[in-house]
Every structure is written in structure tokens, then in C-alpha cells.
């Protein structure tokens, strides 16, 4: 049984993660945190999530509960996640990272930390999305050289980064399968007279509206036919359940940088 700490416990994902841990037979909720200015500091986390009294109060820093947990699950902001990574390094803890929007220096810090502690990091913890990543690799190898490739993603109005981490992950899967780096072929905006589409580019389109949980489509379009691979999430619990699954898998693993491909053993497919 893995003892889990939830960072950002009062957020949309934090609350779902608490429910996912509560419903898991492999994990137990051991700690929870919120930012220091939160009015929920000191509140019972189970009551906050509508699950009844848990005996675990929300703290403003997981360092205050460091002896109580084995793994942190962190879906917060880059600055908070990097702080929790440092805590894990200091105390030999593991961390599951669902935070997106890291700068290049931030990514480098994560890579360095993975030499000391076990880390799972993924743009999306849905099992279905990670199956889609694998399908995209195969489609790109077969169709990529003669198709136009576009990625369309849609999320709720409150999402603060664009394109989504999942859309970037889809682009990386496709570009990598074709022997390219996404940074070299990605086109994130089109406006005005852009000229004809270049051969290898991967286009991105972003929608922010209403309460859309998450929708992603990769389009492989040729003259006369088009293949679309789509994933639609209707409940954030799918991400939360995947992250809890990853925390159980990561517990007692050797230091290293892992992804959901490793958790789900997708490279064997």
C-alpha cells in the first residue's frame, strides 16, 4: 500500500485525486497541501472533499508531513512542483507530476532530479490518451510522409496554458516517430497570408470554451481521405485514477524519469 500526498488538494484535480486515492485498493491518503494563503489550511481534507472526516489536515507545506507519505502527486503550477521535487530529493521520496507549462530550465531541473529519485511525468494520465499516443506513433510511421498533420484540442475556459500538454505530447509522439523534433516542425498560429502549407509541419489549433474537460484530435489528411484519431474525456476522474495508478507503480522504483508508457508497459505493444 503506497502512502500518497496530494499537492494542491483544494483544486479541481486535487479534489478528484483525493477521491481517487480514497477509492483505491492500492493507495492510502497520507497528506495534503494547499498554498499558504488558502483559507483551507488546517481543514480536514476528507471533509473538504465531501468524503467525511479523515483525520488528515491540509498543510501549507508538505515538509510538515514528510514522514507520513511515500509519493507526492502534484498537479499544481511549475513553481510549486519544483519546490516539491526539491523536498522529494531531500527526503528520498517519489513524485508523480501532472503539472504542465514548465520552462526549459524547469525541465532540466526535473531531468537532474530523476537521477536521484523516481519520477513519473506525463502530459496526461488517462489510460485512453496514452493508448492514443501509441496509435499516433504507428499512424505517423505509416502515413506521416505523405499526409498533412493537424492537432486540434479543446478545454474549459479556465485552462491557463495553450496548447495543452496533451496536445504537445501528441505532437511529440508524431514528430518523434517521423525522426523529427517537434520544435522544428510545429506551427502554433496561423493568421493572414501565411503561404502554402509546408511538407513536414504539424499544425495546432486551440479552443477554450465552457466546461469542456478535454478533447484532442490528430488529423492525418491526404487528398481524398483523412484519418482522425480522437480522445474525449468527460470526467476528470479518469486523469486522477491514472495518476494514482502511476503512484502505486512508482513506489519503490529505482531513481529515473518514467512516463505513462512505462507505467502501462506500452512499449511492449
Swiss-Prot record:
GO terms for molecular function: 4-hydroxy-tetrahydrodipicolinate reductase; NAD binding; NADP binding; oxidoreductase activity, acting on CH or CH2 groups, NAD or NADP as acceptor. NAD(+) binds at residues 8-13, 34, 98-100, 122-125. The active site is at residues 155, 159. The keyword Amino-acid biosynthesis applies. Pathway: Amino-acid biosynthesis; L-lysine biosynthesis via DAP pathway; (S)-tetrahydrodipicolinate from L-aspartate: step 4/4. Disulfide bonds: none annotated. It comes from the Bacteria. InterPro entries: DapB_C (IPR022663), DapB_N (IPR000846), DapB_N_CS (IPR022664), DHDPR_bac (IPR023940), NAD(P)-bd_dom_sf (IPR036291). It catalyses: (S)-2,3,4,5-tetrahydrodipicolinate + NAD(+) + H2O = (2S,4S)-4-hydroxy-2,3,4,5-tetrahydrodipicolinate + NADH + H(+); (S)-2,3,4,5-tetrahydrodipicolinate + NADP(+) + H2O = (2S,4S)-4-hydroxy-2,3,4,5-tetrahydrodipicolinate + NADPH + H(+). Gene3D superfamilies: Dihydrodipicolinate Reductase, domain 2, NAD(P)-binding Rossmann-like Domain. GO terms for cellular component: cytosol. One of its GO terms (biological process) is diaminopimelate biosynthetic process. SUPFAM superfamilies: Glyceraldehyde-3-phosphate dehydrogenase-like, C-terminal domain, NAD(P)-binding Rossmann-fold domains. Keywords: Amino-acid biosynthesis, Cytoplasm, Diaminopimelate biosynthesis, Lysine biosynthesis, NAD, NADP, Oxidoreductase. It is found in: Cytoplasm. The keyword tRNA-binding does not apply. Its EC number is 1.17.1.8. Belongs to the DapB family. Catalyzes the conversion of 4-hydroxy-tetrahydrodipicolinate (HTPA) to tetrahydrodipicolinate. This is 4-hydroxy-tetrahydrodipicolinate reductase.
